[in-house]
Amino acid sequence: MNLLGIDFEDWYHPELIKKHHNLKSCEPLIVNGIDKIIDWLRKNDTYATFFVVGELLKFKPELVDQILENGHEIGFHTMHHTRLDEPNYREIFSEELKEFSELTNKKSKGFRAPSFSLSKSTSWMIEILEFHGYVYDSSVVPVKTKLYGIKNAQTTPYKISSSSIDKNDSSGKLIEFPLLTTNFLTKQIPAGGGFYLRVLPLSIIRSAIKSMNAINSPSTFYIHSWELTPEFMPKLNMPLIDHFITYHNLHKAYGKLDSLLKLYNFTSFEKFIK
């Protein structure tokens, strides 16, 4: 069994878009794709965890019922897609958790940091999640890239703590589900979704999933809601590299993940833990 997390965020949330565009008071568009995503999961007999940016639940409260009543799970992705290393965010994080809990009727037990921004300097979030009764986190990419990642972190699920974010701590209370990685041309790279789903050949991703399953470990996979609904994603002007990372093969993400769901079993984090 493998794990599928959908980072449910809108078109103005991605870090590379915010980096180049001062977008305030934007109208959400990607939320209009929720029916398409739910129907797609139903057709594939697959359950997923929706890591939702909380402000979208305030804009469209019915999202909660749409997700939960179809057997899926809601996880926390901060209220405004804020990186953990933003100045003074530590003081705000607890209040956002409380607000999200109210919006979801205390249903959320899992967290994913925007842009996988968990690091030694932001490990404070683990103790706060524990205090609020959270069960797991999925913010570790066990390879270092220019945008995110923790070099040499454990690649299979482990107990995480604020003093040990990269390997098992038997005293840890939270389960960490690190994202899938693989070896490519002698180098370890991410393979668990997003840009890497769009750019890597499916044969490499299939091989990575098989390797994890061969050691009785789930492959943790993710995709952004805007990658599943590119028809709602506006094309914005950005520098060449950032434009490439955001938009390259955007139209292929849905089909590539669909083929993986037909080959391998995926479920939500909640159902896997149970």
Label every PLM stretch briefly.
Residues 106, 113-216:
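Active-site-adjacent pocket scaffolds in enzyme catalytic domains
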Residues 9-11, 55-57, 80-81, 116-118, ...:
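Short, solvent-exposed loop/turn segments at secondary-structure junctions
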Residues 1-70:
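Active-site beta->alpha N-cap acidic-glycine motif
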Residues 43-45, 199-274:
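C-terminal domain-boundary segment and adjacent tail
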Residues 7, 41, 74-77, 111, ...:
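Conserved, mostly hydrophobic/aromatic
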Residues 44-122, 134, 139-146, 172:
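Metal-dependent polysaccharide deacetylase catalytic core of the NodB/CE4 family, i.e.
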Residues 21-28, 47, 51-53, 79-88, ...:
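The substrate-binding groove and active-site-proximal loops of carbohydrate-active enzymes
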Residues 34-38, 61-65, 93-101, 126, ...:
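Generic structural signal for well-ordered alpha-helices
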